[in-house]
Amino acid sequence: MLPDRESLTVEFKSEQRRPQSDDEIVDNVVALANTQGGTLYLGIEDNGIVTGVSEQHSNINGLAAFIFNKTVPQQTTRIESFHEHGCQVVVIEVDNSQQIVSTSNGKTLQRRLKADGTPEVVPLFVSQ
């Protein structure tokens, strides 16, 4: 069963108008890993309506390899695909990391809740 809304550990990504960029997907995986872990759903609108994933992200093996190669330290994710209301949804499960995770291009991100209770991705500043 799909969650009905986003939270600190649940993120919906729409691909109805345009595919998410690969960088946007990796940014969200990094943010989830640096917070509490969680689940990224591709093909679901922010309001929970299923609209389907793009062809670009329907290959789950390629997506897993891409995420692994674009995270430091490399993150292993669990990815599955299913159909809901005739639309393909891709689910990316991200574990909470025991060490700080960054993108391969140096972005370190985390998730937090805004005052209205909705989640956002923000920079994670690490002390040297």
Name these PLM-found stretches.
Residues 1-128:
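Conserved N-terminal catalytic/coupling substructures associated with nucleotide/phosphate chemistry
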